């Protein structure tokens, strides 16, 4: 996932790898917080959500607010989609 996020942000250096990995982890935790199953991180919409979150956190091209809105919208849509809802651990 780190490589995909770096490519999406047009970053080739390894200097920000720790920060970006932290953003990736935070995005996945945020998705889980609203009940989204992130166990299959090869799902295109999960990857897209993580990329949007990272663009928001990095204020990519000074458009962080736009990426925040896009991430929030996708997160809300995924939380309502049956295919992405995590199964209860009852």
Mark where each language-model region is:
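Divalent metal-cofactor coordination and adjacent catalytic microenvironments
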Residues: 1-90
């Amino acid at each position: 996932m780190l490589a995909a996020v770096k490519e999406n942000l047009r970053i080739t250096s390894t200097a920000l790898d720790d920060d970006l990995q932290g953003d990736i982890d935070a995005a996945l935790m945020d998705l889980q917080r609203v009940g989204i199953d992130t166990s299959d991180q090869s799902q295109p919409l999960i990857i897209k959500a993580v990329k949007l979150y990272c663009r928001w956190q990095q204020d990519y091209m000074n458009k962080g607010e736009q990426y925040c809105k896009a991430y929030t919208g996708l997160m809300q849509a995924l939380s309502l989609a049956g295919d992405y809802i995590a199964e209860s651990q009852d």
